[in-house]
């Protein structure tokens, strides 16, 4: 038998303190869950908006690319594409939301000078290049948001599990334990009162 369940005043204080801490823990978990859910909902809305922008920009980019293919030839467009440098400026940092590490993706802004001569190409190629650069920036942002949303969803699930354990197991346990110890102490006090009353009555009779 757990010594902490013995009906003593010390154990009653411990049980009540544990119950108080469990309630505080549940309130904190519930608050954290609500904050994370709000953050997640905001990210979901943002991801939908960025995805729409990507879809529109992709269509614009491919339309411009098709025109460029017709105007200067597919071979020339491919040759120009080989001059596009590999993206090496991507940096990943993190920030914390209620203890959840969220990625921050940074990169040098697009829109740098083209790697080809203007006189040898057409405006359609410039439009395609600019659109694809915009798609790249949007995709980087979307990847950051989707990864953040995944981490928040996992944290929400974990937080909900802890909150449920406090609400359905820990709090009822210490509520019942406090009641049982208090009832047992009260019963002891009644028995002691009855015993002392009996002793007093016997003394009165003897005198």
Where are these regions (language model features)?
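Charge-rich amphipathic alpha-helical interaction elements
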Residues: 1-207
